[in-house]
């Protein structure tokens, strides 16, 4: 290999990874998750207020964590797709992927600490999920491209891991809340089909729609689980 080839390769490797999105796609991506961020702020306020009125401190705290994870995810995603500076875009691309792990753990939090009994089981699942989220964030931060497929697998595995505690979860939450939880998980999972095929034009944008839909259903699930009065 010539010195010129080596030099060109080195420069190429140092360039930030750029997704092949068109301007139209990036506008759509930014708008959809910008709307998601605004809805998340409103939804978080509602969960906190109703949890404070109808339930207790634990519901308020866990609802706040769930809402914060939604707001952070949608904000990071919106900024990532809106930015044009290559260096800034690379940084927010990593943050965008890391917040997926944050959202999964944040979504688990109200269910594990407010719904699942016995209490030790809920706290155990809570610890495992947040531990897995931290590991996922570390690996994605080290090399987003190297661990991309592994990260996608972990998203799905972590998301559906709750089925191993489905009986105590079912016993500790309203039926409507459980239905919304499952349907939200289905939407997220179907969206992953478009996520892994994002090289096709507008498929990543479709993934964004599935994410908004899935998180909306999960918001209803959490709201009914910790914001409504206990029957």
Summary of predicted features, one role per range:
Residues 2-231:
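Multi-pass alpha-helical transmembrane bundles in non-GPCR membrane proteins
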